[in-house]
Amino acid sequence: MSANYWHSTQCRFWSFTKEQLVTMRQKLEEDNAELVRMFPLPQQRRLYIYFNQQLIRLAKRLTIRQQSMATAQVYMKRFYSKVEIRRTNPYLVIATAIYLACKIEESPQHIRLIVTEARQMWGDLVAIDTSKLGECEFFMISEMRSQLIVFQPYRTITALRNELSLVDDEVQLARSVINDHFMTDLPLLYPPHIIAMVAILLALVLRPNNSGPGQSTSGAAAAAGLAAAQQALMRAQGQQAQGGMPEPAAAEPKEKRQQDRVSRVQKFAKWLVDSNVEIASMVDATQEIISFYECYEHYNDKLTREQINRFVKARGLDK
């Protein structure tokens, strides 16, 4: 085990470029062309959303910690970067990922309890027992080459909270963005600290002006906030390249809370320049998150579920 992300197996073996991921997935589809033709599936993002929802449902029944849930989601991404989805029962893979992640994160769950809860959730979709879960665990560990330690972005949020003067609402919103990023390719593309920086930036620009329990950001305000985030990053990137400080925005908002928010975003941009964070990576990751939120608006749970269940039953993977 490495205590340093840069020397970890996650950094050395499980960090890819977008082009590498595309190539890996294309090869899987080419190697399983007949299955792909017979059982069309929604685009990858929609599958991620569905798997995320199912994983959360099972995890809540087991009262599993967020860290273990996050690791389980990374395991699924790694596993399905090596194995064609249509050759597996995703429900068994979800249960296995949770079981394995809990052991690695030192909060183990009894295998019989996970089997029982999985049966109750997906009874007619997976004939799961302890031996099948154990076999799937061995399969998953083998495909991941026993490289099971996962560094998560949550730690960075905690470490920087005081330095960046983040309030409770901003920390909570940043953690929510991190939770959402597991439904994208970002865990396989960028280091955890980059994801954390993006989450903090989005928390600063998306937090409602009148923050209070149960209040949310309107669609128009969210769109404006995301645009502001991209603008701040581009400005910081330009200044970082020049070795200078980010310039303040030309126009000052009249509304005080909005002015305070812009000021905090500018201070964060200055902090990014001073800290030599890879702002280009942040720009790409921010765009990926924004693109995901746009995709989520059009997500069809019923269609996704039906297409997954169709190949599970047609191939006898529920037996």
UniProtKB/Swiss-Prot annotation:
SMART domains: CYCLIN (SM00385). InterPro entries: Cyclin-like_dom, Cyclin-like_sf, Cyclin/Ssn8, Cyclin_N. SUPFAM superfamilies: Cyclin-like. It is found in: Nucleus. One of its GO terms (cellular component) is nucleus. GO terms for molecular function: cyclin-dependent protein serine/threonine kinase regulator activity. Keywords: Activator, Cyclin, Nucleus, Repressor, Transcription, Transcription regulation. Residues 237-251 have a biased composition (Low complexity). Residues 53-142 form the Cyclin N-terminal domain. Component of the SRB8-11 complex, a regulatory module of the Mediator complex. Interacts with SSN3/FCK1. Belongs to the cyclin family. Cyclin C subfamily. This is RNA polymerase II holoenzyme cyclin-like subunit. It comes from Gibberella moniliformis. The gene is SSN8.
